[in-house]
Structures are given as structure tokens and as C-alpha cells.
Amino acid sequence: MRCASRSDELVFFVNGRKVMERNVDPEGTLLTFLRKNLRLTGTKYACGRGGCGACTVMVSKHDPVSRKIQRHFSVTACLMPICSLYGAAVTTVEGVGSIKTRLHPVQERIAKSHGTQCGFCTPGMVMSMYTLLRNHPQPSEEQLTEALGGNLCRCTGYRPILESGRTFCMESNSCQQKGTGKCCLDWGENDSSRLGKKNEICTKLFAKEEFQSLDPTQELIFPPELLRMAENPEKRTLTFYGERVTWISPGTLKDLLELKVKHPEAPLVVGNTSLGPAMKSQRQFHPVLLSPARISELSMVTKTSDGLTIGAGCSLAQTQDILAERIAELPEEKTQTYRALLKHLRSLAGQQIRNMASLGGHVISRHCCSDLNPVLAVSNATLNLISAEGTRQIPLNEHFLAGLASADLKPEEILESVHIPHSQKWEFVSAFRQAQCQQNALPHVNAGMRVLLKEGTDSIEDLSIAYGGVGAATISAHRSCQQLLGRRWNELMLDEACRLLLDEVSLPGSAPGGRVEFKRTLVVSFLFKFYLEVLQELKKLVKLFSVAVGADSRHRSEVSDQFLSALEDFPVTIPQGVQTYQNVDPHQPLQDPVGRPIMHLSALKHATGEAMFCDDIPVVDKELFMALVTSSRAHAKIISIDVSKALELPEVVDVITAEDIPGTNGAEGDKLLAVEEVTCVGQIICAVVAETDVQAKRATEKIEITYEDLEPVIFTIKDAIKHNSFLCPEKKLEQGNVEEAFEKVDQTIEGEVHVGGQEHFYMETQRVLVIPKTEDKELDIYVSTQDPAHVQKTVSSTLNIPINRITCHVKRVGGGFGGKVGKPAVFGAIAAVGAIKTGHPIRLVLDREDDMLITGGRHPLFGKYKVGFTNNGRIKALDIECYINGGCTLDDSELVTEFLILKLENAYKIRNLRFRGRACMTNLPSNTAFRGFGFPQGALVTESCITAVAAKCGLPPEKIREKNMYKTVDKTIYKQAFNPETLIRCWNECLDKSSFHSRRMQVEEFNKKNYWKKKGIAIIPMKFSVGFAATSYHQAAALVHIYTDGSVLVTHGGNELGQGIHTKMLQVASRELKIPMSCIHISETSTATVPNTIATAASVGADVNGRAVQNACQILLKRLEPIIKKHPEGTWENWIEAAFEQRISLSATGYFRGYKAFMDWEKGVGDPFPYYVYGAACSEVEIDCLTGAHKKIRTDIIMDACCSLNPAIDIGQIEGSFIQGMGLYTTEELKYSPEGILYSRSPDEYKIPTITDVPEEFNVSLLPSSQTPLTIYSSKGLGESGMFLGSSVFFAIADAVATVRRERDIAEDFMVQSPATPERVRMACADRFTKMIPRDDPETFKPWSIPIA
């Protein structure tokens, strides 16, 4: 029990209101307190590690020294210890503004700029932007990018979020589109010559002139009581007691030092950014925590003639400002070290983490990937230590970094400050890092390098090099540096230095983190970059000083002009761009919203935090919490499950096992709860039910499961093929005579394509609330799902009760992407068993780690192809064999295989084709539906064939694509009629709008002039088939009520996932009923109002549900027609009142029977898809051949939307899916251990695209509309189609790499691997450095990770 009576009182403010609390848990976070205690649910839980920004809030504190409010700073509430907030003012999204009172300009602009989709990340985005504006009312674009760098969004693609933020920036109030001097919003209205006839084409998605202005004087003031507290600080020690942990916050440095003597093992907690995640993931436990937050001496900054001393308590963000200020004050020669540190600080984590983490904590933690320690180590920084016995200094050197006792802190000592000396003339300091992506990512390798040359010469007087990421801690290459003293700074020295470094900084083949050869290459690549930087600086100095240079070229200090670009880092910029769509007919009534860029129905609620998600539902009386216990073995027999220790814990109510299931335990081979055997790490075995979520999770660790390992254990596709381990029969399509065609071609190529898996990373993890009713075994289930009917059916069979006793409710879903089609039924059923057994409501909310471990994702793919073609590039025969890694159960793997094969031809008409596909059964968690449903993987194989043919023929890939594309009306491989006219239009429009051919020449010119940087450009066509391959999956229903006041309630079978389906349904109802959208409301999706629904998936949600809503509205309007004709001058309200009096039903069910679709796999013939979406994308990139990094320069997308229901929403879907696809092909990499354990289980390890990954110029055009009678108002579903267009970035990178390999006479490699990570790009750009690294025999060590595709 907590000792509340002994605890001091915690005093802080939230949204201007005072909070006084004695009963606080020192292990608790601000996020938990806000959500559970204060019911402020706008702050979201998404990752629990500070890596996504969904829980961002603003904290403000007063500085008694400067007598000013310290900069307001954004923090991630999931890491912020609640006890650390004494004397602070917290502002949450609810405190910024509300739709009930007044919207803040930030909230208004992000909503009206269409910067929200699912809305789960939006409160965090708002708070990051709001905090920025509190500090800088007119920020720079660089500050905006920096502020949002720690916030992730999986839906929007970031462009509209940044656009909303840019409206506050001081550079300009418009984008001044790329050198034209004109705002992109003005194109459609003011430049008809560029965009067509007047009123035909538009680019204005929102009315910026209607935004309310920002008035900084109207913000919430800092609480006067906190001012008084800060000016007369509490000097006594504050103590807060919890059940397991005591938090002690001393008021003076003397008290802190005395406490350190008393509790020498107690860690100091400042930002909790290192300790917090470690306590969670590594199960670290500390009974006493010391907080130095109130010790002002630890935040002092001292400027001296020889350097800068920064208090250990200063945050990394404060350190950033301090360094920037010092750089501005001192001559350049003295600030080399400060510049190097500042460079790393800008990319270190996100803004929130930099605001929380302290300099001292960063240094003392000695993380192997520390970005600052390598630079501090080489710059001769010293650590000022203090204890009750006195002070002393120790060098921050290799001995300290290695943790040697003789060079470390004593248990009773603390770090007071860090002294960083000035650099001097002829001294050069640089920092380098390479991570999976540019921002908010831990580095694979980083380095600090410093050289002091003998004045007036290029002779090395002192040299220091340190690396991070290549060992358990930062490694100093002291021995190598000593051997290079006295050497000239030239090529001979460089060769010797590389040899020495590779020998000293050695990585074993089994090194943690893997990527061993890549890391070895970076060790010498970074050195080469440093070598070039110093040479370039010497070139400047030689004008002032006589530098001794030898006559031999090997002794001459020069930098080739071709090498200069290697010295430039890729800039971080806010994307510019134009979004083009067809305007509505000028004769369309203003009240008719169809075709207009209407704001998302819930956008304002997203921005204010008032949108309710599943876990935002208030606590239900007698509610219990559930946590899952999963398998730690990949394939094993369960010998025993001992739950006794878990049940002994306080607040634990029960443990649910398979024996408690009254009905069916899932399907054969796919159990809800494991029985007798487990077939993957992460399989659910049982579940703990407890009074608190914390105790439920702790109890899972007490359950002891005994296993007996079984054979075989299969993880990879190749192993599955070897063991003939498949989930379903082969799917095959064939046309023409493939073997005969191969005999007649000029050339053939065979190749392999490996496509990695992908995590859905929906921002809202899987969650469900099951509430049992008091009679008839009824249940109310609130669940985050794309398919509530499936949840309903699964719970029914699990509990053995009729479906009609179960009602599933879906208000909104925080992202789905296919991951919430089948999986939520599992969690709903397990929670329902717990609810029935205990008689209590059950809430189950998955942690991000468990969600990623359990739920699976996109299927990894291994493809083999053989392609036959003529010398001019005409493909005559193509044979592709694809295998996908389905995991341990069938799930949707058979359907994914079918869709993959059906869509494999993409945009190409090849007369002789053979496509085969198999789904492999492995001992990994089952993979499932994911946006695109096999097409993004399969089409990459097809496009790889195209690029291989182009390389062999010596022709540009776009020429091969054009030559083999569908040209006239024809039939697909499955004999469905197909007219390629719109496909060709998209291709030609993309070529034209992207200025492809002229830019191709510019790319080639750039590549001639640059050796270490290369550009690439690619254009990709797309034919995407929409829908399910079965008629029954296209049906939909709707229920529309008109109430006597004239208001309308619409319910339908679609689920709001962020794709705007509710908004579009209101647009449909508004048009059909001829009333304003404001008169119509959608509350939720419920199986009680619209039964037997189909999953909201396959891009047809708005299509089919729109037709059902249309049908219902037309029925109602037909009933009203006699009244309207009789009283044409009447109002809507008059007509409804009259209808009621005449006993006319004001409720109607609408129904759409669905599109006809079928596929006969025996005959290879079908009409499986109702229609196609066509598109094309052109992307240009620049790669760094020395590090593998890349920058997206420009992307142009042309998409066939036919007649868009809502251009703003549709463009948002295209941009979001494109960026998600880009992530699949570039940065998103799942890593598994040789034991089948998923390493990538948080945003720390798994990198989805961030703000800085958006192309610098990002243009999207909806092709001018055409008519199709098949769909609602001739619209098309665009939810998935943009996904594959992200491959244009992949092929642009491949184009740049191919240029490198041709230039260096390296043979073509027809094995394609996705994603194109920095590791793969760097190693493909083979050079002198990749050749010099040692390589290990794979038979001699156990790798850290294994490839599963």
C-alpha cells in the first residue's frame, strides 16, 4: 500500500487549475495521471517510449535565477514522471482550446488544412506546434520542422500538417512555389494558362484568408502561485512513497549529496528518457529514485577563456541553445567542437526528448549509440564531479566510456557539469552519424573526429577519433591515432589510417545490432569524409599560411571538385507542392457538397482532443483490466502453466486460459489461446485480469510456463520451401505459350526479389472494452476494428451465445491499414471470456511492444523471375514465382496470394505469362491484411524485371515501361476486359507535369560532376484493381432516420478509420436529401443498427456504403415527394412535420447488393474486380554513396480519381498511402533474432517515415474526371492505390545506385532487396572502402538477426 500519509504534497497546475496530490505513485507518469486521474484523454497513449509524440503536452517552469518563465517546452507525457512536476504548469490539448468554447488558431488551422485523418496523432501535433508558438509566435520553417520532428503520423504523409504550421512562419505567409514567386494556392484561380480552363482546375484546398489570427496575449498565463513558489522555493526535501518505489526530491545540493551517500545505488532521474524505457523493457527496478530537478547549481553555465562549462542538469535542448549562442559570440576557429555537437543535437531524437533529457544523463548513461560522447571524448572534455566529500575532475576519455572503475564516478558522486574546451587554430573537429532515417532515429554508427595540425603545415600533431554504435559503449581509437602522429594529411596517411582503424575498431560477425559489414564500412567512410573536410579547410588556410605540400600527387593535399558534394549534409526542408483537382461544375448548387474539399467531419474534435477513441471511454463501474501472456518459444509443446504466483499478487482477480472458453477456441490451427503447443514467439497463451492495468501487466511476468522445444523450427521462406511447409495450395495464372516464347527471344535474365515485411503501426494500438449486461448474456463491445461484424461473430462462437446478444460499437479507429480487420476479433473474444467469467467489464489495451509482437503485418515476399525479351526491350515471355511468409496460421494469406497473382502484371501487356504464388507456413506470428493486399510486394517484382531488362538493353527503364505497357483495349491475364486509355493518360500527364525528360538530363549532368553523391529519377505506372474478388463482399446497408425537427441521423456499415468515410457519407446524404450537411449526423457504426456488415477494406468502403446511403435517402425523398410538390415553398422542417402528421415513415433502410465479381482459379478466368484505379508517379532522389543516406528531392503523382467525392480527403489518402509505401521500400525494416523473436517492437527500432522524409517538392494531381456509371457519382476508392507509387522512390534510388555501379565497372546485380535502407544502398555502392573491410565466413558465427524473406 502507498504511504500517502507520509508523502509530501505534490503541487502543480494543469490547464490553469491547481492539482494537489499526496497519493501519487512514483512509478506513475504524467500520461497516466492525466488520463486516469483527471480524465483528460486528449493526450494519447501510442508507444509508451517517447518515440511517437502522441502524448505531447507543454510544461512551463519559472526560473528563479533569471526571474523569467523558462522556455515553455514540449514533453512526452508517457515518460514524464508525475513526481517530477512539482511547481510546474502543464498544458494539455484540452487547455489550448475547445469546440465548446474557443478554438485556438493552431487547432483551427491543422483541421481546416486537412492535417488530420484518423486524428490519433493530432493532439500531439497540436501541442508541439502550440509550444513552438508560445516560444516563437512567428517561427522559422526550420524551427517548425524541428518542433515536429518527434511526432509521428501514419495517415497524412505530413504535408498538410506542415502546411498548417507554415501559415504561422515568418519567412512568408505563402509557399512562394519553387522559384515562381507565386503561392501554390493561387495557381488554379490566377493562372488558367498553366492549369486549363477557368473554373476547371483548382488547387485551393482551404481558405487561408478565413483563419483567425494568432494573438499571443490571449494565452493562458503562468499561475501566479507557482511564481511565488519559485521565488521562495521550498528548500526541504520532498518525498513521495509508492508501493514499491520512493521518490526523493531534495531542495539543496547539500541534501542531494547526503542522499547519495545514504542511497548510493539510487539513480538520478531528470528526464527519464533513458531510465524510463529501460525500466519498462529491461525490467529494471530501483526502490529509490533521486530527483535533482530543484537543484539550480546543476543547471549553471559558465563561460571562460578556455571553454564552456555546462551544468549536468541542463536539458539537451538548453545545451543546443547554449552552444548556438556561444558559436555566435566566438570566432569560428574556437567553435569547431561546439558546431560538431550542435550538428548532432539537431538530429538527436525528437524535440520532446531533447527537452526532457539532460546533458549529464546522456553522458553518464554511456549508451553505445550516444551522439554526444564521441565528440566530447575527442575534444578533451572533462567531467566535474561532486560528492559530500568534495569535488574532482575526470577526463571524458576511453577509460570513462569503457566504464573502468578507476575512471568512473564513485557511487556517492554525481556529475555536476561538463567542461568543453574551445578549439584552436589549426584544429579541426567534426561529427558524423548515419541512422535509418534523417531525424529521430538512433544512429547505426556515429563518430567524433579531431585533428590538430602543426601550425603552417599539414603534419598531424594530435589526433583523436571515437565511434559509437560499434561496441557496448563509445570506442576511442587511441592506438590508431597515436601511430598516425607526425604523418602528413594526405592519401598515404588515409590508407594507413583506414587499415589501423579497421584493426582497432573490430566488430565480430555476431555483434548486437547486426549490420556488421555496413558498420565497418562507415568506420572508414566517416574517416574519409573527415579527411576531405580537413583538406578543404586547409585549402582556405593556404591562402593565409604556407602549407608544406609534396610534389608527388600522393602527398598533395587537394580535394577534387567531383568530391566536394561529399562534404554537404542533406538539408532539412519543409516540402513545397501543388495539389490539383477538378473544380465542381459552376452550376452545382452551393449547398451540394459533393466534389468539394470538405474538412474531415471530426477534424476539429481531433485537434482539440475531444474526439473519443476506444480507450477514452470513461471507466465503467467494477471495470477490470486484462494483460496477455505470450509464448517465448517459436515451436514448443506446453508442459505446464503455473499461475499461482500471479494469483498471489494483490489486485489480481483471475487468469484466463483455454479451459475457460465455453465455446469454440478459435479455428483449427489458429487458437485464441494456445492449447498443448505454441507455434511462434508471441502466441497468446493466457490472460491476466486485475484491478489495475499496471498490476495485470506485472502479474504476467509471474506466470511460469514450461516448454519442450519441437522441430522443425522454420522462420525463412527458403526454409519453408525446403521443408515443403505451405499454408494453402499454389495459385497459378498463365497465358500464351511461355516455354515456346523463351526459345524465340534474343535474351533472357533470371533474378530474385526480396521484399521485407511491414508493421501497420497504426497510432492507436489494438484495444477493446467488453461490458457484460445483467441479463440474457448480452454484451456491449467497444472495439477499434475495421470489421465489427467479425468481432461479433467470433465472440458469439467463443462464448457459445447467439449473435443477437452481442453489440459491437465503433466510434472511430485510430488507423487500421488492414491490421484491424481480423486481429481485433481475437482480442475481443479473449476479453469477452474474461468478462463472462468474472462478471465484470474488461478493458484490454495492448502496449506497442505487444501489439507489434502479436499481430503480424505485411507479408514478406521472395520472388524469382525469368524474363525473355528482344534486343530493343520488348518482353516476349515472363515467368514469376512468388512466395510469401504467412507466419504460423492461414489468416488472410491465401487471399493475399490470390490478389498478388491477380495484380502481378501491373500496367503491362505481355503475351506469354506465367504467375505462381505460394503462402509459406513458418514459426512467426501470422501475417495479415495490409493496405494494398499483396500488390505492393508483387508489383515490385514486376517492375524489377523491367529495370533488369532496361539495364541489359542499355536503355532507360521508362522506355522499356512504355514499350511494354497496355496500348489498346485488351484482356488481362485473367481474361477481364480492360481499356488502358486512362492509364496512358496518367503516364503521359506524369511525364509532362514532372518535366521528366529534361530532369533526366539534369540528373545525368549532376552525376557527371559528382563522384560521391548521385541522383536518380524514376517514373512508375500503376493499374490497381479495387475491391474484393467476390460479389458478397461488396454489399452494404444503411439506416437513415429523419427526426421531427428535421435533423437526420445516418448509420451505415462502414467504419471511420481516418479515411473520411463518415464525411463522404454525409456529403452523399446532403446531396440526395438536398439539405445542408449541418442537418445530418453520424454517431457510430454499430452491429445493432446495421447488421451483417463487411469489413471496411479494399478501398470500396465509400463506394458501397455510399450507394446504400444514397438508396435510403432516395427512398425517404420519394416518400416526401407528394408533400414537397404540394408545398414547394415550404421548408425542410415543414415537410418533415407534415410527413409525421400524415404517418409517413421517416426511417429507411438502404441497401446495395454489390458489384459482381468472381474468379475461377481452375480455369484461370474471372471478373474479380469492379474497376481499376490508374496512376503514375515520378520521384527524384539524391544518395550519399559514402553513407547510404538519401534525400527525396521531388515527387509528382498523377491519380485517376474519376469524379472525386471530396478532393481534400482523396488527396490526403494518396499522399498518406504514398508516404507509407515509401516507408515500406526505404526505412521500415523488421528484424528477427535467430530464435524468431521480433527485435523491432517500438518506434526506437522500427522507423516509419517522419517529417523530414517527405519529398522537398510534393505534387499531387487528380486526373480531370471521367464518368463511370458503376460507382457512386462516378467516384473511385483511393485508399490503397498510392501505396505502390512509393516504389518510385525505391527505383529512383536504384537508378542512382546503378549509375554508381556503371561508373565503377561493377557488374549488374539482378537480386533486388527492399527496403533500400542506408545499409543496402551503401554496400551496393562498392568502392575502395567496401573492398578494404574484413568479411566473416557466415559459417563461423551466429548472426544477430536473420532475413525472413
Curated annotation (Swiss-Prot):
Gene3D superfamilies in the record: 3.10.20.30, 3.30.465.10, [2Fe-2S]-binding domain, Aldehyde oxidase/xanthine dehydrogenase, a/b hammerhead, Aldehyde oxidase/xanthine dehydrogenase, molybdopterin binding domain, CO dehydrogenase flavoprotein, C-terminal domain, Uridine Diphospho-n-acetylenolpyruvylglucosamine Reductase, domain 2
All residue ranges annotated as the 2Fe-2S ferredoxin-type domain in the record: 8-96
Biological process according to GO: xenobiotic metabolic process
Subcellular location(s) per record: Cytoplasm
Binding positions ([2Fe-2S] cluster 1): C47, C52, C55, C78
Residues spanning the signal sequence: none
UniProt-recorded Gene Ontology molecular function terms: 2 iron, 2 sulfur cluster binding; aldehyde oxidase activity; FAD binding; flavin adenine dinucleotide binding; iron ion binding; molybdopterin cofactor binding; NAD binding; protein homodimerization activity
GO cellular component term of the entry, any: cytosol
Cofactor remark from the record: Binds 2 [2Fe-2S] clusters per subunit.
Expression tissues: Only detected at very few levels in nasal mucosa.
Domain FAD-binding PCMH-type: 240-425
Binding site for Mo-molybdopterin: Q117, C155, G816, F817, A1098, S1099, V1100, G1101, Q1213, L1278
Residues at which FAD binds: L268, V269, V270, G271, N272, T273, S274, L275, A349, S358, H362, D371, L415
Assigned keywords, A-Z: 2Fe-2S, Cytoplasm, FAD, Flavoprotein, Iron, Iron-sulfur, Metal-binding, Molybdenum, Oxidoreductase
Domain of life: Eukaryota
Record field: catalytic activity: an aldehyde + O2 + H2O = a carboxylate + H2O2 + H(+)
Top enzyme class: oxidoreductase
Entry annotation: catalytic residues: E1280 (proton acceptor)
Enzyme Commission code(s) on record: 1.2.3.1, 1.17.3.-
NCBIfam families: mam_aldehyde_ox (TIGR02969)
Known function: Oxidase with broad substrate specificity, oxidizing aromatic azaheterocycles, such as phthalazine, as well as aldehydes, such as benzaldehyde and retinal.
Subunit structure: Homodimer.
Sequence similarity: Belongs to the xanthine dehydrogenase family.
Protein name per the record: Aldehyde oxidase 2
